């Protein structure tokens, strides 16, 4: 009897208890994460009417109409430009900063300086940088004029607005720098010393020892950078509302405008589904190459 009771207790503790603990988080994950995805997929086949739901069934017409507009493809082009800038300026540069920061003696003090800008709310950060880019009294044009250049209308120039939106990420990318720095400091000193004895120092040490040992952190940050860039909404919208002339309109802004300005829920849902599929495929490709390198 005691043995049977013990088995029941073991079964409850090892098999049932974990599921009971995870039941509520799983429920909210399904409700708040996966249900909206299936709901968006469902709505994308309707001329959705929020009052008389779900509205008229139109099949793939929302997708056809969306693919036939130049505005939609311009939003994709802008999203990929932002992706390139995000990788170049907010992904690669923090890696380089962390490598140099690791060579300094007072790295703890400087690490704190990197962390402080991340505490500034996005709204306040945008207000500060809009002032920096102001064509009349902004710091950016003061610097340009100091070096003999011509003042620029930064946020009103289609060729400059993307750079202006991404550039603050270099200053606010302190968390990424600290993650890379932590990964670098986590490399075993024995590995570094052995490499030094074999003549692997300087740039060779960075290329053959440091970067391979922080590859997983780089991969995670790369996935986050890709996902963030493809879904970018807040910064382009607060800086330029997708302008000028749609030059900073991303897929995020396109979807937002479809819902909030045009009240075209079917088109917005269709765009959301396509964006989700693109991000998913890109993430799977990245994971495939990461796994291939491990093998």
Where are the model-predicted features located?
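Short, Lys/Arg-rich, polar N-terminal cytosolic tail immediately upstream
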Residues: 1-12
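A structural signal for multi-pass alpha-helical bundles of membrane permease subunits
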Residues: 10-295
């Amino acid at each position: 009897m005691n043995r049977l009771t013990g088995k029941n207790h073991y079964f409850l503790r090892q098999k049932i208890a974990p599921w009971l603990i995870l039941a509520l988080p799983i429920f909210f994950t399904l409700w708040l994460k996966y249900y909206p995805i299936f709901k968006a997929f469902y709505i994308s086949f309707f001329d959705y009417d929020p009052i008389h739901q779900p509205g008229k069934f139109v099949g793939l017409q929302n997708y056809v109409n969306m693919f036939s507009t130049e505005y939609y493809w311009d939003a994709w082009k802008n999203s990929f430009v932002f992706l390139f800038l995000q990788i170049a300026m907010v992904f690669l540069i923090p890696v380089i900063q962390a490598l140099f920061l690791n060579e300094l003696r007072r790295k703890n003090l400087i690490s704190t300086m990197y962390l402080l800008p991340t505490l500034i709310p996005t709204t306040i950060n945008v207000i500060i940088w809009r002032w920096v880019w102001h064509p009349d009294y902004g710091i950016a044009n003061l610097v340009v004029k100091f070096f003999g250049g011509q003042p620029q209308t930064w946020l009103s120039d289609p060729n400059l607005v993307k750079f202006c939106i991404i550039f603050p990420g270099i200053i606010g990318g302190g968390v990424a720098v600290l993650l890379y720095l932590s990964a670098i400091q986590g490399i075993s000193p024995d590995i570094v010393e052995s490499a030094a004895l074999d003549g692997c120092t300087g740039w060779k040490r960075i290329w053959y020892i440091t970067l391979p040992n922080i590859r997983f952190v780089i991969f995670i940050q790369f996935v986050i950078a890709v996902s963030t860039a493809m879904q970018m909404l807040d910064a382009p919208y607060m800086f330029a509302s997708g302008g000028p002339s749609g030059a900073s309109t991303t897929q995020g802004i396109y979807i937002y405008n479809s819902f909030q300005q045009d009240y075209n829920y079917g088109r917005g849902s269709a765009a959301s589904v396509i964006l989700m599929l693109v991000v998913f495929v890109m993430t799977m490709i990245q994971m495939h190459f990461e796994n291939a390198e491990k093998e």
